[in-house]
Amino acid sequence: GLVGSEMCIRDRLQRDKRKPLLNRAIMGAYPPGSTFKTAQALTFLQEGIIHEDYPTFPCAHGFNYGSLHVGCHGHGSPLPLVPAIATSCNSYFCWGLFRMFSDKKYGSPQNAITVWKDHMVSQGFGYRLGTDLPGEQRGLIPNAKFYDKAYRGSWNGLTVISIAIGQGEILATPLQIANLGATIANRGHFITPHVVK
């Protein structure tokens, strides 16, 4: 066990407001933001919502639908998938999610989000990755039940549009985001992250 000065050091570290003992890579869950857009793109491609070259979606400094506006920076418009990823276009991914949640093949936004969540889970989000380090968090990928409770059953793709760009209720650990990048680099091959000794 710890004795004397070691206990003092431990106690000081535990009281430190900067939390130096918190392993943020696995214990911190944060909105992933634009790093999440590649997961969205893979989902939209697999579901046939988009293809590499079409459709192109407009971006007039953001996604605009009625009075709803999700901002974006200035770049060319309209865009297909690859330039949308390259410019991190918020509008493109909002339109993709809106199309998916409005698609009649799912029957309802509740069914669409169930399919969407299954894709996110298959890409390593919403559950622990199974690393050999203690304290790994699972993050949060909301499901229909989550939104039915939050909005009393009255929601649609526009209500939850911020999840299209990794905002809103989405939470991921830095390790989950790094794992998504590694899985893409490995051409879809998922490897459980572990510590190399």
Pin down the residues of each PLM region.
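Beta-lactam-recognizing serine transpeptidase/beta-lactamase-like catalytic domain environment
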Residues: 5-6, 10-35, 39-197
